[in-house]
């Protein structure tokens, strides 16, 4: 089978394979597209937490992006972990040069086990310089609270935070509601033209490592294949929900989701 599209991932590596670039590659491949990578950091972690983070020299990150895209131009880009202000600025430089229009940003800030993956200066740079460059930003509730300096307890708060991100220059926002203690989980899509709330039953499991990475990569994949952005979000949420339901009970902590689940449910993604 020939890949449907080409996706460049700019993100950190997760040695346990559940999140980061490893989750991105699995997601993109399982949905039928071709994945390329630019590694921004190496995280030494397992399902119980992050032991340490090894930074990649920003110039080497830029080189990965430019050299790869010079040969194979991606249809879309997914951006994940950018742990420093310097890294963010080099990534902005690179995406300005390669001129890809479809860019999804997952503002990775805190690992599932609670470890911080980005510093305060980088958050300011992301707010001021990067958000306006991308097509969609996909924060979870803790990330949206940090980016907007607000408290989020319900759907109205999620919409309010999304509108702040629009004022920062975001074109579209998907605030993920998985951290709410609701039986029905809302994911809120907000643009300057509309608000759409996706509602799904909460799945009770500790095995949710990599759900944010998986969702943003799934959105990027559907979007890269020509699906409208809002529809891409809807399909990606379905994919992640099925991945969680068929989760892998690996490790002693937060186990990974099952990226191979799409093989069984391809009819959903038409």
Go through the PLM ranges and name each one.
Residues 120-195:
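Conserved phosphate/ATP/ADP-binding segment of small-molecule kinases
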Residues 31-36, 222-236:
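Phosphate-handling active-site elements
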